């Protein structure tokens, strides 16, 4: 029987929520543990499907993986493989990060092109160009990527675009190369900086992670380390937008306010009062919500593409008009047609969606087709009269550590059920 979320209109939210570790940080760090010769201990690891799938890959490669609460212990000393099975690789996009780690560790890697959210093309070409610059052969044929190098060498390489995945793969591969590697036009996301900090804790000679230029002195053996994953800025944005949508007051603990500046600014424009501490964010929305200024998703430090769906959903009840433009993933707006089923007045022109807010919303049967779009449907249904049913909850579980329980604790009315019918 398929699982579904039943979501009713929410009262104003109230309480405290703790932000989990960042999905987009823990996944590359888990891949990076393959480069260590001794065990690693990672704190603040979210319990999400993508982490579960990554641990399955590590175990297949010979690593020992144990979880205790939010702490993962990874022992790579049993490492014995250099290929990821298609069934595991196809479960998520982040499996591509094992290419760089395996290439650095063994000089060879094979991987079926990975799956993930169907939000647009995320070509592997940038990754392969980086591997070739380091002296590897790297080809994709029939849906399988194969990389090989007798010996990797340092190089100055410039990425065609600031791709997060390509930056991470280039960093990992460069650690196995002799000499210095300079990565130009690198992605600057906080998760890149977190990966760099973890690698430095393991003994890597690396500078500039989180800036457009990263320098790596490769060829050094890495040891294990104990490390704490940074807070998830997209989960943070989701909670903030939920409060903006439903009203009330929330305090978020273990947050990273600086990484959420774009979302905080947009919600401040809407009439929300937000106060930030060192690792806390308090949001209060009592009066009516007003439309924010038009938002365009851009690479960090621009507005995060992953936060746009939940901000758009929060704006459904806002008074006025606004627009949302996507510049990164061409199919990001798959969820828009589902929000229309709730009565939302949305029009799409290419990569821009225009919203006329404050339209009456009613319950509907919805289907999540991707992770962040699924979260947007939850926030939309929390504003609609009646009880909505959301299918495809596995997409939400890929990246949120029990979103249902967190929102329930703040007063939201939602629950997971098994639906005994085919939909």
Explain the meaning of each model-derived region.
Residues 1-423:
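Short, structured segments at the rim of ligand-binding sites
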């Amino acid at each position: 029987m398929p699982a579904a979320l039943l979501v009713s209109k929410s009262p104003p939210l109230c309480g405290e929520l703790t932000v989990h570790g960042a999905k987009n940080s823990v996944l590359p760090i888990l891949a990076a543990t393959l480069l260590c010769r001794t065990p690693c201990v990672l704190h603040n690891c979210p319990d999400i499907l993508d982490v579960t799938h990554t641990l399955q890959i590590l175990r297949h490669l010979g690593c020992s993986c144990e979880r205790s609460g939010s702490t993962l212990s990874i022992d790579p000393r049993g490492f014995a493989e250099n290929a990821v099975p298609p069934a595991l690789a196809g479960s998520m996009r982040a499996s591509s990060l094992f290419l760089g780690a395996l290439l650095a560790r063994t000089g060879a890697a094979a991987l079926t092109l990975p799956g993930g959210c169907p939000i647009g093309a995320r070509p592997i070409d940038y990754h392969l160009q980086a591997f070739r610059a380091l002296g590897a052969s790297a080809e994709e044929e029939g849906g399988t990527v194969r990389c090989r190098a007798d010996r990797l060498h340092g190089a100055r390489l410039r990425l065609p675009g600031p791709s997060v995945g390509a930056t991470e793969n280039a960093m990992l591969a460069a650690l196995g190369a002799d000499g210095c590697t300079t990565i130009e036009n690198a992605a600057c996301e906080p998760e890149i900086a977190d990966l760099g900090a973890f690698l430095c804790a393991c003994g890597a000679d690396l500078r500039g992670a989180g800036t457009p230029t990263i320098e790596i002195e490769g060829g050094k053996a890495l040891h294990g380390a104990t490390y704490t994953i940074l807070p998830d800025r997209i989960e943070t944005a989701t909670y903030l937008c939920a409060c903006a949508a439903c009203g009330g007051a929330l305090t978020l603990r273990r947050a990273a306010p600086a990484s959420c500046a774009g979302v905080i600014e947009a919600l401040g424009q809407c009439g929300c009062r937000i106060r930030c501490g060192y690792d806390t964010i308090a949001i209060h929305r009592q009066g009516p919500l007003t439309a924010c200024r038009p938002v365009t998703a851009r690479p960090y430090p621009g507005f995060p593409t992953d936060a746009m769906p939940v901000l758009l959903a929060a704006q459904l009840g806002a008074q006025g008009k606004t627009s949302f433009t996507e510049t990164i993933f061409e199919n990001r707006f798959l969820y828009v047609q589902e929000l229309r089923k709730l009565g939302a007045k949305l029009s799409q022109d290419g990569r821009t969606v225009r919203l006329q807010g404050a339209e009456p919303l009613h319950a509907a049967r919805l289907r999540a087709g991707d992770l962040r779009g699924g979260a947007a449907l939850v926030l939309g249904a929390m504003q609609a009269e009646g009880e909505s049913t959301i299918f495809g909850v596995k997409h939400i579980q890929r990246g949120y550590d029990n979103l249902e329980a967190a929102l329930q604790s703040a007063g939201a009315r939602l629950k997971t059920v098994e639906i005994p019918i085919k939909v």
